[in-house]
């Protein structure tokens, strides 16, 4: 059984026991339990239920493993030819690692 759940504007395929890296969740502490109720699709052994826009009564219960994980560094380089203009910016996205404890559908 799996579900498609929307977390912080992104969609994830969630199964019990799976770990996910989601966009940073504010005020989340390690070991805290969080629930996500924006379940868009439920697949129960081939029986598919699609929400309009969400499935009523379905939710995903997760435990926060690590509240702040930094992603890989992305470098953005700007240059204008023949003018000597060069600019380098870097960015590291912040994530929260969660473990899916239970899928209620």
Curated annotation (Swiss-Prot):
What GO molecular function annotations does the UniProt record carry, in alphabetical order?
A: rRNA binding; structural constituent of ribosome
Which SUPFAM superfamilies does UniProt cross-reference here?
L21p-like
Question: Has UniProt tagged this entry with the keyword Ribonucleoprotein?
Answer: yes
Q: Could you tell me the Gene Ontology terms of the biological process aspect for this record? A: translation
Q: Does the keyword Ribosomal protein apply?
A: yes
Q: Which GO terms describe its cellular component?
A: cytoplasm; ribonucleoprotein complex; ribosome
- Specify the superkingdom: Bacteria
Record's InterPro entries? bL21-like (IPR028909), bL21-like_sf (IPR036164), Ribosomal_bL21 (IPR001787)
Per UniProt, the keywords (alphabetical) are: Ribonucleoprotein, Ribosomal protein, RNA-binding, rRNA-binding
**Summary of subunit composition and partner proteins:** Part of the 50S ribosomal subunit. Contacts protein L20.
Similarity field: Belongs to the bacterial ribosomal protein bL21 family.
What job does the chain carry out? This protein binds to 23S rRNA in the presence of protein L20.
Q: What is this protein called?
A: Large ribosomal subunit protein bL21
Organism, scientific name: Parabacteroides distasonis (strain ATCC 8503 / DSM 20701 / CIP 104284 / JCM 5825 / NCTC 11152)
